[in-house]
């Protein structure tokens, strides 16, 4: 058994760690609320953009945009959104597991893959995982802007336009609630047809001035909005996961302190008992 002094030092060390994790929990809680507000503000735009694009895709178009045409999948791209920092539980690990499983399934069918990681953890993972990394972005901070993503996203769009990619997916952690974040893989291109649009009647649109120009702009904005929404959803998920992880660490530190305090008391008791025994033995010898 360690002596009382060593145990006391250990208790002090764990208490200091507990203060740090408790502070990190409070910071994460504050950042999570801001991230939730940002996510809630952008979600209606992303959802309505998806509905509009899905509805347009069902119309009888004079011009058929390449983003609406399904072609044989020979090479697919993944835009994978992760965190820049760690200490957020298994958030990134679960996301990477889902991507790896999907990539394995694609490769078994003879499909090649390439990646566009967003977030330092994603960049680090895919550099070591293997596979072509065509573009990346990191260091977006706690208030990411669409302008910071446009260049990266357009690298993947250019590859799709040139026929180098036949499918494009975005992967991120969807924020469900504080205790639950779900990794999802959503197809961006070719444009997936929503179930609502499939059962509703189709509309014919009159385009002014030109359907090609309109769709070129609208579809690019659609892809950018979906990727941005994935980034802000992932940020809210990150702060929620970090808050939960730090709360768990703080609670575990408290349990460890209680256990160490018990060991310390036993060590003190043993030391005092030994001293008394030595005194009694010395007195008996005299």
From Swiss-Prot:
It comes from the Bacteria. It is found in: Cell inner membrane. It holds the Pfam family ATP-synt. One of its GO terms (cellular component) is plasma membrane. The keyword Transport applies. The keyword Chaperone does not apply. One of its GO terms (biological process) is proton motive force-driven plasma membrane ATP synthesis. SUPFAM superfamilies: ATP synthase (F1-ATPase), gamma subunit. It is a peripheral membrane protein. Keywords: ATP synthesis, Cell inner membrane, Cell membrane, CF(1), Hydrogen ion transport, Ion transport, Membrane, Transport. InterPro entries: ATP_synth_F1_ATPase_gsu, ATP_synth_F1_gsu, ATP_synth_F1_gsu_CS. GO terms for molecular function: ATP binding; proton-transporting ATP synthase activity, rotational mechanism. F-type ATPases have 2 components, CF(1) - the catalytic core - and CF(0) - the membrane proton channel. CF(1) has five subunits: alpha(3), beta(3), gamma(1), delta(1), epsilon(1). CF(0) has three main subunits: a, b and c. Belongs to the ATPase gamma chain family. Produces ATP from ADP in the presence of a proton gradient across the membrane. The gamma chain is believed to be important in regulating ATPase activity and the flow of protons through the CF(0) complex. This is ATP synthase gamma chain.
